[in-house]
Every structure is written in C-alpha cells, then in structure tokens.
C-alpha cells in the first residue's frame, strides 16, 4: 500500500472548533500510523467572511495540539488561476457548459414547481449548445454560469466508515462549477485542489457526505484518480442537537484558556466516534497512533460531554510527570511560583496534581503554598466556619502550637484527639481546617498538605481563620 496523503482543510471564518479539531486529529493519526503525509489547506475563498486573524488562530491551535503538518500551508485563494484554467478546459472538452438561465428565470421556474407541488429540477436548456452558439450569446451580453454535464448512470463510492454508497445521477442537477462572476464553487475547487495535492484519503465530517458524489463526478469528468473517503460522525450536545455554544465552549482556544492540556483534548476527542477494541479510555499519543483504525470508527453521532472531558483531563493530569506539569503551569502563568525554590515547586505540584483536573486547578491549589496569608471568600466563610468550626480551628491551633514534632504521625495523633473531643468523624473535622489553611473546599491529603505548608504558615492561617 502506498503511504497515504491526507489533508485538513478548514475555512478561516472563525476559530478552530471542537469538530474541526477532531477532524484534524483523525487525519493526523491516520497519517502518523501509516507513515503518511499530513497537509494543511486553508479554504479562504469566501472573501467576505475569511480573516487573516482566523488563519493565525487555526494554525496556532493546531501547533498547540501538536498536529505538525508537512510542507507549507496551502491557501486555496492562491489557486484561482488554476481553477479558472480547469473550468475553461472543461468547457472546451464538452464536460461542462455555459448556462444562460438568469437567477430571475430560475426563481420563476422554482415557484411554478412549488405551486404544482413538484420537485424542482434545473432545466438543461443550454446543455447541448455548441461553443459557437454559446459565444453568440456571450456576444449579446448575456451573463452565464458554468455547469457540469452530469452523465447518466450511478455514482458509487466506498466509504471507510459508511461502506458502499450509491447515488443515481438522475437525482442530481447539472450543478454550477463557476458562478456568473467567474468564481468557482466549493465542490469544484475542492476536487481540483485535492487532486493537485495528490490527496489519497479524504477524512472529514459526515455533513460532507452529500457533497461526495458531486466531487467524484468532477474527478471523473477530468479523468482524475478518485481518493478514498472516510466520513466521521457528527458531534452532538447533551440534548442530541448539533454541538453549539449553548452546550459548551466550542473552540479550542477556550479550552486552552481553561487549562486543558493538548494530551487531554486529544485523548477525549479521539473517543468521539472512535471505539477501541478494549475498555481502555486513557491513552498517550503513541498509544493512540498505534491503536487508531477506521474499522472502529462509528456512524452513530458522538455526544460531547464536558464532564467526561474533565474526567479524562484529571486522569491525564495524574499521569503527567511532575517536571512536565511544572513546565506546563509556568508556560500558562509566567508569574506562578515566582521567587520560589524549584524543589519546593516540584514538591507542591507532585502533591496537588492528582487532585487537579486542569492546569488552572493546579495553579489555584498550588498557589496556596506560596502565599503568606489567605484571602477568605466571605460567602464560603459563612457556610463553613460556624461557631463550632471556629472552635475546631482554635483547638487545632492550640494543639499544634505546643507540638514539637512536625511529622505526619504527630499530626494524625492530634486529629484523633480532636475527633474524640468534638465527637466528629475525620471528614467533618477536616472541612473547616482545610478551608482555614487554603481558602478552598478541596485539595490534597490534609496531613501531607500541612507538612509541606510548614508549622509557622499553618499556625498563622489557623489564627487568621479563628478571628473570622
């Protein structure tokens, strides 16, 4: 088998969204697994909506995710002369023709069909006009579009996800490949660009299934090799409607800002439509490349669940090497741990990363180890530090103040005595203590945390909390 050449071809009309990132991932995984080539083409022919800032954001997001594309980025807008050249070749060859039906004429015909409750079909009035007849109409100043001459028969293709798909060409109109202003249409330029880039496998969302027969007809009209297709299942929100901003953040940049790592995003996206032959859900990148197979990609729409993403992220956070986690946090927040000893920072991250789901969690929890004092949230203080809780904090301060051995066993003994004194279980005892020491309602094990904070810092914070 020849090594595959795949492409990711986003339109720069917005930020890279979750669906686009999943498409890029599956292309990238397939190329990596099979020693192939992963290309990036920006489909920027929509002049009004395409923006340079979106191109930059898309390429930055792909780089952040680690999807290293081969060769230079291809801008579709740079291929305009090539597209026009092929349109003219097809007119000369008789595989396409100029259609002089105006928009107004087509609208009238469409309305007549609607009145009769008939399916509207574009008339093939000019399909068999000779080049001379077409030129005569041009000389009269008639505007025209260019349409593909669709032959009789069946268009059939084999999809790696959907299997064999057949479309009767009678169901298709002679569709436009160039508009009246000369600009080529999507299904035409995609086929030309994919052929010119030697794309062997087209991997994209299943919303493009309906476009595929049209693109195959363009390939056939030009005598071009037809690539292999794989259409990925749609991503839905929890309400089973297409994923949108009302369900969750939809672009990759937002998840980066929320503190998700590339590995967590990639791991979760891989599970949206792909079902490995095992119960394994947590993968590193090399494991994903090795395991990925289109035989396991499902037709059924995938449901995006941000809670599941958080769970995957937490699992990845726990597996991350401490030194790597420190680097990730420092790259996200340059002020994090400033003027702190590197060993202490590593010790802090090693302690808190198993309880964190994102890098933002890591920053929030670890920050309490660097502060001299804690700013307590007023609302949380009222809920957690009632009179009995304040007494627990005060009693703990008194016991710690006279304890000379700052060791885990000594702390455990003090807490045992407090449990007896206040007739409480450890969980209820820890809640106000944790809040007093960190200002948070969650975090690492209380004894390990206190050891790392140090006696003086613990005493000062307990004293501050007891005064609330």
Model-derived segments and their meaning:
Residues 222-228, 232-376, 438-468:
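Catalytic adenosine-cofactor/nucleotide-binding cores of aminoacyl-tRNA synthetases and other
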Residues 27, 58, 90, 94, ...:
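Residue-level signal for inorganic ion chemistry
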Residues 1-7, 252, 287-292, 330-336, ...:
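Short amphipathic alpha-helical segments and their helix-coil junctions
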Residues 98, 102-231, 236-243, 251, ...:
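Active-site cores that bind ATP or allylic diphosphates and position pyrophosphate for catalysis
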Residues 6-12, 40-44, 197-202, 416, ...:
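Glycine- and acidic
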Residues 1-115, 211-224:
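N-terminal Rossmann-like or analogous alpha/beta NTP/dinucleotide-binding catalytic cores
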Residues 21-25, 263, 427:
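Short, acidic loop-beta-alpha module within alpha/beta folds
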Residues 386-437, 442:
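C-terminal accessory/binding modules appended to enzymatic or scaffolding proteins
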